[in-house]
Amino acid sequence: MLSALASTIILAAAASFAAALPTATADGASKCTTPEKRKSWHDVSESDKKAYLNAVKCVMTSPQKLNRLPGAKTRWDELVSLHQIHALQIHTTGQFLPYHRYYLKTLDFLLRECGLPKEVTLPYWDEPRDAGKFSKSPVFDKVLGFGGSGVGAQSCVMDGPFANLTVNIGPGFKTQPRCLNRKITDFLSSSCGASYVTSAISGSTYKQALDAIYSGPHLYGHMALSMMNGDSITSSGDPVFFLHHGFVDKMWADWQAKDLTKRLKDISGLNAQDPAVGFSEFSGGMEVESAMWGKPGQELLAVTPDPKSGDGGGTITLNHIMSSLGIIPNATVADVMDIKGGYLCYEYA
C-alpha cells in the first residue's frame, strides 16, 4: 500500500505533468476515411516483416529523449518504463484495455520516428491459429520473427533479430540490466484457442468483457511465454508483447463491434488497483506482490501521473486522461474507444 508520502509525491508529479503536457489530443476530431489494416504476423509480407523488425531494432538503439525516466537509456527503454510506471493503474483496472490501445499508438509513433514506412502497419498475433503450439508459430522464426525460447538458467534469447539483447528496465520496479528472456510453454497456449476467445467476448457489458479477456487469453498468452512475460510490470521489454497486445486489442474491438453504438461508450472499473487485490492473477494483494517485484521508489513515483486525472474520483470515465509522459500527446479514454473514430484509424484484417 502506498504511503502518505508516496501519495503526496504522485499528486505533485501529476500537477507538474498537467502543466507540461497537453490534456487532450487535437487530432481526435479528424476523419477516418481509409483505415489502415493491421494484419496477423502470419499474413504480413516478408518485406514488411523485415521493415518492422528493423524499425523495432532502431527504437532499441535510439538514445532516450525524455531525460526523466529512471534507468532509460534508449527510446525502447522509455517505452518499457512507461508500462512500468503505469503498471498499478493499467492492470486489474478499467484502464487496462483503453490504455494498452493507447500504448500501441505510442509504439507506432516511435516506429515511424525510426522510419517505418506508412504502408507497414502494426502487426498483431492471431493466437488461435497457434494455440497449443506457440513454439511452432512464425512469430518465433529465427529470421523473419522474434527468435524462440531462450537457453540456459536465465532462458536468455540467443537466436533471431533480438539475440543477446540487454533489457534495462525491470525486473518489476527495478532497473537492473538483464537479458531478454523467454520460455515458451505450448500447453498453456491452448487457452488462447478460438473457443476461449469466443467465450471471452461473449459478455454483454464492458466489465464482463474486460474480466474475461484479462484473465483468459491475455493472461495465458503471457504465461505461455513465461520469464519476462510473467513480469506484469515490465513484460513489454519483449517485443512480442506488442503483437500479443494487438491480439488483445482485436478481441476488445471485436466485442465492441457486436453492438457498436452502445459499446463505444461502455467503460467502467477502477482507475487504479485496489491495494487489497493488486493484480488479479496473484493472490495476497500488493503487499505480497511487492516481495516479487519490489515497490516503486521515489524516482518512479515522482513521474507517475495521477490515476484519477480527468475522472474526479476513483472510477474510470470517458474523460480519463492517459499519458505517455511526453512521447505522444495525452489522450482521453473517449479518444481511443473507436478504432475508426479519427484519433485512431485502423481495422483488423
Go through each PLM region and give its residues.
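Fungal secretory targeting signals
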Residues: 1-26
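Intrinsically disordered, flexible peripheral segments
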Residues: 21-349
